[in-house]
Amino acid sequence: MAPLHQVVAQVWKPVSNLYQAKYVVCITNNREEADIIGYQVDVEYKASKAGYIYLAPIWYSKGTPVYFTKDPTVADLKLYWTKDQSEVLWKH
C-alpha cells in the first residue's frame, strides 16, 4: 500500500531566464519515494522528523491533489533551494 501524501504548498522555481516551472511541495514518510518521484530540497523541518520533503513537478499530480502521508504539522517549515540556505523558497 503506497503511503498517503499531502500537498503543503505550490511554488514556482526559475528554470531559465525565459520561464518558471511549477512544483507542488509534498511531504511523505517514504524516503525512497521522495528521492525517486521528487527533487530533494534542503529543508529545515522542525515539526516532525518522520516526514521527508520533496518537490514533485505539477504535472505529476495531473491537476488533482497529490497523494500523501500521515498529516504532519507544517507549523515550523522552511524550504530552501540552495545548500547555503540563502534563498527561502517557502515559509509556513
Outline where the language-model segments fall:
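Repetitive, compositionally biased segments used for assembly/scaffolding
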Residues: 2-92
